[in-house]
Curated annotation (Swiss-Prot), chain A:
This is Acyl-coenzyme A oxidase 2. The gene is POX2. It is found in: Peroxisome. Disulfide bonds: none annotated. Its EC number is 1.3.3.6. Pfam families: ACOX, ACOX_C_alpha1, Acyl-CoA_dh_M, Acyl-CoA_ox_N. Belongs to the acyl-CoA oxidase family. GO terms for molecular function: acyl-CoA oxidase activity; FAD binding; fatty acid binding; flavin adenine dinucleotide binding. Heteropentamer composed of five different subunits. Pathway: Lipid metabolism; peroxisomal fatty acid beta-oxidation. It comes from the Eukaryota.
Curated annotation (Swiss-Prot), chain B:
FAD binds at T149, G188. This is Acyl-coenzyme A oxidase 1. GO terms for biological process: fatty acid beta-oxidation using acyl-CoA oxidase. It comes from the Eukaryota. GO terms for molecular function: acyl-CoA oxidase activity; FAD binding; fatty acid binding; flavin adenine dinucleotide binding. Keywords: FAD, Fatty acid metabolism, Flavoprotein, Lipid metabolism, Oxidoreductase, Peroxisome. It catalyses: a 2,3-saturated acyl-CoA + O2 = a (2E)-enoyl-CoA + H2O2. One of its GO terms (cellular component) is peroxisome. It is found in: Peroxisome. Its EC number is 1.3.3.6.
């Protein structure tokens, strides 16, 4: 009808408009994929077998009516708490008799679609159960299993660590467990309101028992914080045990499905045997035995960190898929007069906003897998350890230490990266990113607690930085250090390394660039550290002074790790058909990371100003290359529309149809008057203001 | 006196407050623009705080339905001020109330700024009078909304597809939605409230398309709120935030409106279908600037609220011990915690200076434009001057809007993280604050798009400068020679702390970036058209806008300090230096690359940032008290004035969630059957083979 109508788009001789074009555009985009998507999925999953298992589990979740997420974004807190409980009940059936690896897969996949259920079950199986298994003796573990802790019958556990006035600093906790030798009991007590257990997931509604962190006090002596099992509620009627007070923490930023609560203990008595005694033991006479190596007790904390790195990938891939699919069908502004508007994926700046993040999401997977495998090997070694194997023990302790610092940095930067991915992909979807039905808002609110719990990211980063400096100090003394920091051994080479005309698209050169950046930061911080120690500061004080340096060291070291792990996994596992597409992503990630932090490389003299221009050109180039395959790269994540749960990111690209339909399903347009029309709106629109009475008395 | 974790906080807060070395009221007055302004602000704040309808005590537990109704009640409570407030008072009221209740601010502003603003800005004076008579200003039997965005099209006005076809026979326009992709979408006020809208549609007369224009279209019958014939409206439902705003969608099916409902201040259509286009089209976009300017101010107001919470909490919260202490260390005393928050405090102050400057320029420019008649040839010169100024303001406000709304989102997020777990509690406001806030980065111009367009404007200005032509004051520095010559020996400490040097360092960085991008542009346009060349330079345009805007904030901050009273000057200077040096630290690549600073300088700057953090640290309570926010506006127990955080937080949680029943509401239906379940064994077939 109208030649200037920018909504008219012709494809293969047929006319489409803004509403009808998207699925056709999506099919065209999908056809551009030059690599076998299925092979890429196998690569990401770690082989065909894993992919098939994932698919089976995804299907089980998706087909279960209880896991229907059509209404998910419109549930209020009360509704979602109840639904979450129903889902927990269902999921617990799978936990009972399936291999541990499958359970992990199921949890991770549920976590993409419903973070609340994942956590609420995790409160029992990850935290309570993990603590009893990890810090209880074999007999104690057997006892709690017999009580129902294994299959959640007449039993639900929670994990009472944090207090109102104290977070993750175990040493500062104030709840006490005083041994009463006469009755052979511990008396658990909350000394004042700030020592109230706080944020305890599962406490407000569900839990019958808890593992409580309290100061072990025997004969007036404080032995520090240990873990105790305390029953919270009577099993038969869910009423509170004597001395227990519990309240609901109420509204949170996200994760409404979890019943976080607070707990106060007023002289609650528990049998001595409820102290978890794998490491610290108290006998009938009140003799306390402490473990030889405290580090070994931290193993269980690493599990959480490793799985958060992997979750960061899982959640990150969902949102990058939504934003990239939408970018391939959304048109906005016209670059050539008279032509249809341009697809937003074709704007160079839009590519720069999203494609490096796509590469980042891939990189997270490689590193999470690598650290996960290292962790499993170490745990096996630890389990196999003979009590008299001194050398073996030293090796395990050193491995655990290294894992502790590697996982700290990885947890921090991957959970932050995922938060950033959710936030940036939302903004990349413009207004529709703000709609509740496209999932960004809820996911961000649900996700970001990952940056705080199980170790605040900033604190973890600072502690990883501390460990890096300690490794450098050890190296200077000729002591052995772990693999993750072995590049520091080449200190002298790194100090003066330059690009010297080598290619910036050679993986070896890029890894070296990051080793130079990280190595020099760590070594410079170590110089400063040794100087401060020489000036008479103690180690804690010196590390405080070097806070900014520690943070930087951990940041750059972790980025180096991500980049090296990405290239190395491609090298060892990628088949020919997907090698180049993966290399394009890894190069984009490494180069973009340099661009984002160009100061580091200029400062160390590895790059010169003109090299930075080259880096920018290369980032543009790889964006252009990767752009052609974005549908392939994201299809390879293998998420069905159920897991995407965002109409603008659905597989077929028919974004406006699905989105319009979803909005109207959830908000049927029946009455143009709001529910409060008669009570509020009408009286307002039709109000008559009363005039102020004016006193009419004339003055005399 | 011995205290414990629970009783220690208010004692600590009093001690911290006692460290303040300046008269807090002086800084408050400096921020507000004088004692007289402070008094106005305080009067408005107490009128908000005392109104029971505006009480926000239970807001964090409202669901969507409750929030919608409550917001309507608040709109009603605030509506009398629409008539009595001056423009200045109205801005203050909206900004102050918006700090604690962003939904009400938006829902009211949909009518008051977007609808009324369009009628006033794009309608003729007679048209404006007509709609006033219908009740538009008094909001009686009238509520307006603003139907611009479409499902398939955002802020690109040219791409909109709704049509307004002139029917000469009936002297009417026919408003029509051609397909679902052209449904008006996100229209605040449409789902529940509005009787009328300003609709953006393509003007089509005698088959010719004259581009997008504004039309007033009645949506509902006034007496019973039923929909007008041909109007379909639905509810957009759940959003990330701002639940109190009833965003809706609207479809028009051949809806007829009188020709006079087209807003004709600029383009006109006569009863014979003759279309007159305005002499200067740009002026129609001037109205968009209002939104940007007020978002800069909002960024400051919302930031100051969350910074106050995080810094007060940091002064009473203890976590971990450093060697030798019996008590844990206050988190404000950790160098890294200072680095997380104090540069952001400085950033927040800088936003205020930038906001005031932008608002002043905007008011002057608008007054001038409204006084001019666009169709009077005698006023051509004045008009052209006004257009130049508007254009410049348009570009400057784009960058400021983008970076201050992003800055504020970052501040809310970082402050939340700095409060650890308690930042995640609904009752400390961060979650809702973030969810409500971030739409500011998208609406009225997506921040990225705004930055790119500003970058384009900067290159165009540089071309003007190179051609010897006049450019506005804020960009003239691009034509100056840099006063910095780095010989590789490094920069002395005094220089690195001197405002002149720091402003010049940023100007040099910005200038070099803009000029290098301009060179590349001139190279590219030899073979490409300007649009293509600018697309190639997207990354560079973004960087230009970013550095120029940071430069602008830093120089405005220093300029404003020059007007401050002597007793507060040193404290403000520390903040400004912290902001400038931290900005360099965040962007070392630029300064090394442009040879403005040496690697050694960067090390020195790292330690200067540390030093300034320590210097500002003792004044944080004074510097945040100076924002003048009562606990009502803070609305977060861990950020309360007296520092009694645990008592107030514990009380709040229990008020909102009385602990009466240890069994959840779904105990009988769900939990008990689960805990006491008996699984049925799978039957095993007993037949022997």
């Amino acid at each position: 009808m109208n030649p200037n109508n920018t909504g008219t788009i012709e494809i293969n001789g047929k006319e489409y408009n803004t509403f009808t074009e998207p699925p056709v555009a999506m099919a065209q985009e999908r056809a551009k994929t030059s690599f076998p998507v299925r092979e890429m999925t196998y690569f990401l999953d770690g082989g065909e077998k894993n992919t098939l298992k994932n698919e089976q589990i995804m299907e089980e979740i998706e087909r279960d009516p209880l896991f229907n997420n059509d209404n998910y974004y419109d549930l209020n807190k009360e509704q979602i708490r109840e639904l979450t409980m129903e889902r927990v009940a269902k999921l617990s059936l799978f936990v009972r008799d399936q291999p541990e690896d499958d359970i992990k897969k199921r949890f991770a996949l549920i976590g993409i679609a419903d973070m609340g259920t994942y956590t609420r079950l995790g409160v029992h199986y990850g935290l309570f159960f993990g603590a009893v298994r990890g810090t209880g003796t074999a007999e104690q573990f057997g006892h709690w299993i017999s009580k129902g802790a294994g299959d959640l019958r007449k039993f639900y556990g929670c994990f009472s660590m944090t207090e109102l006035g104290h977070g993750s600093n175990l040493a500062g906790l104030e709840t006490t467990a005083i041994y009463d030798e006469e009755t052979d009991e511990f008396i658990i007590n909350t000394p004042h309101i700030a020592a109230t257990k706080w944020w305890i997931g599962g406490a407000a509604h569900t839990a019958t028992h808890t593992v409580v962190f309290a100061r072990l006090i025997v004969k007036g002596k404080d032995y520090g914080v240990k873990t105790f099992v305390v029953q919270l509620r009577n099993i038969n009627d869910h009423s509170l045990k004597v001395g227990i007070s519990i309240g609901d923490i109420g509204k949170k930023m996200g994760r409404d499905g979890i019943d976080n609560g607070w707990i106060q203990f007023t002289n609650v008595r528990i049998p001595r045997q409820n102290l978890l005694m794998k490491y610290t033991k108290v006998d009938r006479e009140g003799n306390v035995t402490q473990p030889p190596l405290a580090q070994l007790t931290y193993g269980s904390l690493i599990t959480g960190r490793v799985s958060m790195a992997s979750d960061s990938h899982q959640v990150g891939k969902r949102f990058i898929t939504i934003a990239l699919r939408y970018a391939c069908i959304r048109r906005q502004f016209s670059t050539t007069p008279g032509q249809p508007e341009t697809k937003i994926i074709d704007y160079p700046y839009h590519q720069r906003r999203l494609l490096p993040l796509l590469a980042y999401v891939y990189a997270l997977k490689m590193t999470a897998d690598e650290v996960g495998a290292l962790f499993s090997r170490t745990m096996l070694k630890m389990d196999d350890l003979k009590p008299d194997d001194k050398a073996g023990l030293n090796e395990v302790v050193s491995d655990v230490k290294e894992l502790f610092s590697v996982s700290a940095g990885l947890k921090a930067f991957s959970t932050w990266a995922c938060a950033d991915v959710i936030d940036k992909t939302r903004q990349a979807c413009g207004g529709h990113g703000y709609s509740g039905y496209n999932g960004f808002g809820q996911a961000y609110a649900d996700w970001v607690v990952q940056c705080t719990w199980e170790g605040d990211n900033n604190i973890l980063t600072l502690s990883a930085g501390r460990a890096l400096i300690q490794s450098a100090v050890a190296l200077r003394k000729g002591e052995p250090v772990g693999n993750a920091v072995s590049y520091l051994k080449r200190y002298k080479d790194l100090a003066n390394a330059k690009l010297n005309g080598r290619s910036l698209t050679d993986p070896k050169v890029l890894v070296e660039a990051w080793e130079v950046a990280a190595g020099n930061i760590i070594n410079r911080a170590t110089d400063q550290y040794e100087k401060l120690i020489g000036e008479g500061l103690n180690a804690d004080q010196a590390f405080e002074v070097l806070s900014q340096q520690r943070f930087q060291a951990a940041k750059v070291h972790t980025r180096r790790h991500l980049i090296a792990a990405f290239f190395s996994r491609i090298d060892t596992e990628a088949g020919e058909a997907i090698k180049q597409p993966l290399l394009n992503l890894a190069l984009l990630f490494a180069l973009w990371s340099i661009e984002e932090d160009s100061g580091l490389f200029l400062r160390e003299g590895f790059l010169e100003p003109k090299d930075i221009d080259t880096v920018t050109e290369l980032v543009n180039k790889y964006c252009t290359t990767v752009r052609e395959e974005v549908i392939g790269y994201t299809d390879a994540f293998n998420l069905s529309d159920y897991f995407i749960n965002a109409p603008i990111g659905c597989y077929d690209g028919d974004a406006y149809r699905h989105y319009f339909q979803k909005v109207n399903e959830q908000n049927p347009a029946r009455d143009p008057r709001p529910p409060y029309y008669a009570s509020t709106l009408k009286p307002f629109l039709f109000r008559e203001e009363e005039d102020d009475d004016i006193c009419e008395l004339d003055e005399e | 006196m011995t205290t414990n974790t629970f009783t220690d906080p208010p004692v600590e807060m009093a001690k911290e407050r006692g460290k303040t070395q300046f008269t807090v009221r002086d800084v408050t007055n400096f921020l507000n623009g004088g004692e007289e302004e402070t008094q106005i602000v305080e009067k408005i704040m107490s009128s908000i705080e005392r109104d029971p309808v505006l009480s926000v005590t239970a807001d964090y537990d409202c669901n969507l339905q409750q929030a919608r109704k409550q917001t309507m009640e608040r709109v009603a409570a605030l509506s009398p001020y629409l008539v009595t407030d001056t423009e200045k008072l109205s801005l203050w009221r909206a900004q102050l109330h918006g700090m604690v209740d962003m939904s009400t601010r938006t829902r009211l502003s949909i009518h008051n700024n977007l609808f009324i603003g369009s009628i006033r800005g794009s309608g003729t004076p007679e048209q404006f009078k007509y709609w006033v008579k219908k009740g538009a200003v008094a909001v009686k039997q009238f509520y307006g909304c603003f139907a611009m965005t479409e499902l398939g099209h955002g802020s690109n006005l040219k791409g909109l597809e709704t049509t307004a076809t002139y029917d000469q026979d009936s002297d009417q326009f026919i408003i029509n939605t051609p397909h679902i992709g052209a449904t008006k979408w996100w229209i605040g006020g449409a789902a529940h409230t509005s009787t009328h809208c300003v609709c953006f549609a393509k003007l089509i007369v005698h088959g010719k398309d004259y581009g997008t224009r504004n039309f007033v279209v009645p949506l509902r019958n006034v007496h019973d709120h039923s929909l007008k014939v041909g109007v379909s409206i639905g509810d957009i439902g759940k959003k990330m935030g701002r639940d109190g705003v009833d965003n809706g969608w609207i479809q028009f099916t051949n809806v007829r409106i009188p020709r006079q409902n087209m807003l004709m201040r600029y383009a006109k259509v006569s009863d014979t279908g003759v279309v007159t286009k305005p002499a200067l089209d740009q002026l129609t976009y001037g109205a968009l600037i209002r939104g940007r300017v007020s978002m800069i101010a909002d960024s400051f107001h919302v930031s100051k609220r969350f910074l106050t919470i995080a810094l007060r909490y940091a002064c009473v919260r203890r976590q971990f011990g450093t060697s030798g202490d019996t008590k844990e260390t206050k988190i404000i005393d950790y160098p890294y915690h200072q680095r997380r928050l104090l540069p952001l405090l400085a950033y927040c102050y800088a936003m205020k200076m930038g906001a005031d400057e932008a608002q002043k320029t905007w008011i002057e420019t608008t007054d001038r434009i409204l006084a001019l008649n666009p169709n009077d040839p005698a006023q051509k010169n004045d008009l052209e001057k006004a257009v130049t100024d508007t254009k410049e303001l348009f570009a400057a406000s784009a960058g400021m809007k983008a970076f201050t709304t992003w800055g504020c989102a970052k501040i809310i997020d970082e402050c939340r993280q700095a409060c650890g777990g308690h930042g995640y509690s609904g009752y400390n406001g961060f979650g809702q604050g973030y969810a409500d806030w971030v739409v500011q980065c998208t609406w009225e111009g997506d921040n990225n798009v705004l930055c790119l367009s500003m970058g384009r404007g900067l290159v165009q200005s540089a071309l003007q400068i190179l051609a010897g032509k006049h450019v506005g004051a804020s960009i003239q520095y691009v034509g100056d020679k840099s006063k910095i010559s780095q010989n590789g020996q490094g920069t002395p400490r005094e220089q690195l702390l001197s405002p002149e040097f720091l402003v010049e360092a940023f100007r040099t960085a910005s200038r070099n970036n803009i000029l290098r991008t301009t060179d590349k542009y001139q190279e590219l346009v030899k073979t490409l058209n300007p649009d293509q060349a600018f697309e190639e330079l997207s990354q560079q345009r973004f960087q230009c806008a970013r550095i120029h805007t940071r430069q602008h904030l830093i120089s405005s901050f220093y300029a404003r300090i020059a007007t401050a009273k002597d007793d507060i000057k040193p404290h403000l200077l520390k903040l400004a230096n912290l902001f400038a040096l931290w900005s360099i630290e965040e962007d070392t690549g630029i300064f090394l690359r442009e040879n403005i600073l040496t690697p050694g300088d960067i090390d020195l700057i790292n330690s200067l940032v540390d030093e300034l953090c320590v210097a500002v640290r003792d004044q944080v309570i004074g510097l945040t008290d100076a924002f003048g926010l009562s606990d009502f506006f803070i609305n977060a127990p861990i950020g309360s004035y007296d520092g009694n955080v645990y008592e107030k937080y514990f009380a709040k949680v229990n008020q909102q969630n009385p602990a009466t029943n240890p069994r959840p509401p779904y105990y009988e239906s769900t939990l008990k059957p689960f805990l006491f379940r008996e699984e049925e064994d799978d039957e095993i077939c007993d037949l022997d083979e």
